[in-house]
């Protein structure tokens, strides 16, 4: 999600004390704001039903929402509607300690937004990897891989995310090479230095953060916890695609990744061909 948050203007309503039902290695979480699916969203949820196996699935939605589609196979969890009022509220929610506390009974959550595809049932091997966060890789303008990336289809270790958000201090000694490259642009460095000057831990940085939530997890979260580990861009070409899906498949040895995000926006012709071939 390439969107921006206006600090202090997002009226989140923390859902403390709430818990997602059940527990285990993985919960697939689909945030949803409308009770009606578009045709493309219906395709995406059908791939989740087809390849999601027996992994538990949850629709996370505003309180009072009525579903006009079949929700068989999904548990539901209603939150205050303020937490879904626009992309800014969503980004802020995804950087909130109370959000990950909802899933404390699970080792991982797989965020599967309604514009995602699940292309394989091989989810379990990714749960065995040591990483805290996996998302579709970002590319540089010249087509080179940049970093692990987008949060729309992302695997997250719940305990590691909670450790970051509860951290009281950051350490510059944890800066990785990809993080350092971003800091050289200036904007990220100003955020970091400004935060370190004020203190306040991860909660303080999040309160002033005006970028998309996945950028927080990629470029800042590792500074707050030694346990928060990220894969390289090369290591996630098998996990997901967003932009440049053909290039992702090429880099993955000609194989489709586990999933995709924003598939209708990036090379739709490729995905139409791919979905048709999977249906045969």
Give the location of each predicted region:
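Short glycine-/acidic-enriched loop or helix-start segments at secondary-structure transitions
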Residues: 69-70, 120-123, 165
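Short beta-strand-to-loop acidic/aromatic patch adjacent to the donor-nucleotide binding site
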Residues: 106-117
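Conserved donor-nucleotide/metal-binding helix-loop-beta segment in metal-dependent transferases, i.e.
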Residues: 117-148
